[in-house]
Amino acid sequence: APLEYRGPFKSIPTKIPGVHFSEQFKESAKIADKITICRSMSHGEAAHERGTHNMFTGYRPSPALAYPSIGSVVSHDFGSRANLPPYVCIPKVPNEFAGSGYLSSSYGPFGLGGDPAKGDFKVKDLTLPNGITEDRFNKRRSLLNTVDDHFRQMEKSDALSSMDNFYNDAYSLISSKEAREAFDMKKESDKTKERYGKNEAGQRMLLSRRLVESGVRFVSMTY
């Protein structure tokens, strides 16, 4: 394409014959045969908000129906594994269309509440609060179960079921060493972090890889 259309950067060949990337993606070009290039994504919306809805749900916006995000559909259909949330957003839930829509809110995304690109990165509520021992934690959980059993006998609702699932997932995260390690960026060497790039995009992608390898089924990353 002419310079005025393509910009100042040239294209370079990749590992896939006939496929070219921008010269800014030299390392990606070397492994192009190991990634999937999505060419089918398009939409006819003029507004960014409506286009974002399409991206996250696969549907055009409807005034009559709140569609679930693709991550929530995956969460609903496949569930969790390895005590990890099935659907995680890095670093946080990016917009209202990333939610569970008409599905139960228990299939909504798990937001980190922190940025893996920052040195003090910590996932919210993944460890016990200061001053709370494991014994005290277990007693609180037992008391909560007693109260919940009482309410379940009196009333059934999506809100109560979702809270049950929320607490159970939280307990699994806190009590699982493997789950905590999946979010622990300190497990990665400086060399690996350098290869991904010590910036927002690189470190968020690195954490995404860790989570998928550990058992998270769907990761949505924003940078």
Task: Name what the model sees in each region.
Residues 1-223:
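Ligand-binding pockets and gating/stacking loops
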